[in-house]
């Protein structure tokens, strides 16, 4: 199956409405990942089909969970997941990509320029040391244990905001170790077309 058709079929299976222009931009992002990966080791994946599934479709499962937000922070963004695919599809949301690895933030800056993402800002630094970002939703994909994620980022969450942590298997143990002042709003299993692995999103808020 041609890559454009694979992406289109995956998006349709997920029930998402994403324009042709945005889909083309998502594939251009995959091209940038492949190009820069040779030097910067952004992802262990080399196969384009797997990149479409793991980096595009997997990231796009976040979209229904950021409806109505104006600002989002992607912590430990790495090669830009889920932040860049979200930014491509939601140009109305101001998104900050944060990572401590300067090679990765150099790639992110270049990707933002080449993809024309006016709604994205890249910040290089450790999350605990960042103080000039405040977001309606703070998200991460495979960044840290839930308790660490919320404690390290609580100062970056706006009042009334929430965390959206993208996880693999149901994180029962991690949920049990959350601090008392954090409320579990929802844990939802995610279906990613073409991905033979468990995925969950955990929505958390301050009590």
UniProtKB/Swiss-Prot annotation:
Annotated S-adenosyl-L-methionine binding sites: 76, 81, 127-128, 141
Gene Ontology MF terms: rRNA (guanine-N7-)-methyltransferase activity
Key word Cell division present: no
Coiled coil stretches, renumbered: none
Known EC number: 2.1.1.170
SUPFAM superfamilies per the UniProt record, alphabetical: S-adenosyl-L-methionine-dependent methyltransferases (SSF53335)
InterPro entries: rRNA_ssu_MeTfrase_G (IPR003682), SAM-dependent_MTases_sf (IPR029063)
Gene3D superfamilies referenced in this protein's UniProt entry, alphabetically: Vaccinia Virus protein VP39
Superkingdom of this protein's organism: Bacteria
Localisation: Cytoplasm
A GO CC term attached to the entry: cytosol
Cytoplasm is among the record's keywords: yes
Major subcellular site: cytoplasm
Similarity comment: family membership: Belongs to the methyltransferase superfamily. RNA methyltransferase RsmG family.
Protein name, UniProt field: Ribosomal RNA small subunit methyltransferase G
Organism: Neisseria meningitidis serogroup A / serotype 4A (strain DSM 15465 / Z2491)
